[in-house]
Amino acid sequence: MKYVVLLGDGMADWPMEALGGRTPLQVARKPNMDSIARIGRCGLARTVPEGMTPGSDVANLSIMGYDPRRYYTGRAPLEAAAMRIPLGEKEVAFRCNFVTVMDGIMDDYSAGHITSEEGAEIAESLKKVIPGGRIYPGVSYRNIVVLKVCRDAVCTPPHDIMGKPISDHLPRGDDAHILIDIMERARPLLEEHPVNRRRVSMGLKPANMIWLWGQGPAPSMPRFHEIYGLKGAVISAVDLLKGLGVCAGWRVIDVPGATGTIDTNYAGKVRAALEALGSVDLVYLHIEAPDEAAHSGDVEQKIRAIELFDERVVGPMIHGLERSGEAWRVLLLPDHPTPIEIRTHSTDPVPFAIAGSGVCVDSVDAFDEISASEGGYGMIEGNDLIRLLIAG
């Protein structure tokens, strides 16, 4: 038996007046996802335990079969694992976003999706403002900073405060002044940086501030195969997902042209997933684009991202599995909702569908938040999804 998790990040949403009281999933043309719902069994999953922040880190850890209340230590250490960054016993990893702040307002959590090359050039120049720490450039606006302090500071994700004053959301608590000092000392350097001068001259958003958040020590997790007896692989453009794969003992597959945006290499991801199933039992295929569109507040882009996920990932993946001649099961879902209305994540349960060999079919005939609520699985905890997928 081969298993595939098809995950559209942030696809779930709330009913919108602009869409006639429907959600983007209900409006989007998605024949392949609807087909999985028809030939499979649906339900709703609480991927974010009560009291935890609805980040992609918590939600995906849960979907992978780990209880976040037991194993979660922070987002940044997972991304550090993906980047093979060593963390000492007393070291703490922080996510360091390049952001755009205008008149004290968080204008863009990604600095206009600055390129990785530009980000690396800026990161190199920031080493002087992080005494006793280290900075590692990642993909686009994402970087990792390693410090030996501030483990218990309260930090806010920048995508949660789009359009809001940053002064209300600066780090708080023990040693938070150290983080604020680093962020403030970087600002004059960033304002004068050649990369930002070029970006402004081209009408692009500058990376005029850094934002530290998501901190934690290195996680300690049992390997996936030790729990479930299966070998796994993960395919994603996002370091967070790769880091989860590293911590789970999965094979991490890099696909050229995988961008984490709507123009990603969909065909390359599907091809890599089908090839990987020749040597592993389960592939976790993650697409970031719907979430990025939702954070930007662009409902049409989110609908388009959902449709591309359906057309270029879900359809070809099912076709490839059917041609393989092997028994298979698929789990289809988002990790969390990212409602356009609030432009950040929510804790609402997400729709899911499991289809394939030996799955008992229910009466649901469409894949969306409302239809899945009538599914045969009912409401379950997110960390039980993998067990359901294996059990059928």
From Swiss-Prot:
It comes from the Archaea. Pathway: Carbohydrate degradation; glycolysis; pyruvate from D-glyceraldehyde 3-phosphate: step 3/5. Keywords: Glycolysis, Isomerase. Signal peptide: none annotated. GO terms for biological process: glycolytic process. It is an enzyme of class 5 (isomerase). InterPro entries: Alkaline_phosphatase_core_sf (IPR017850), ApgAM_prokaryotes (IPR023665), Metalloenzyme (IPR006124), Pglycerate_mutase_ApgM (IPR004456). Its EC number is 5.4.2.12. It catalyses: (2R)-2-phosphoglycerate = (2R)-3-phosphoglycerate. One of its GO terms (molecular function) is phosphoglycerate mutase activity. NCBIfam families: apgM, hyp_Hser_kinase, PRK04200.1. Belongs to the BPG-independent phosphoglycerate mutase family. A-PGAM subfamily. Catalyzes the interconversion of 2-phosphoglycerate and 3-phosphoglycerate. This is 2,3-bisphosphoglycerate-independent phosphoglycerate mutase. The gene is apgM.
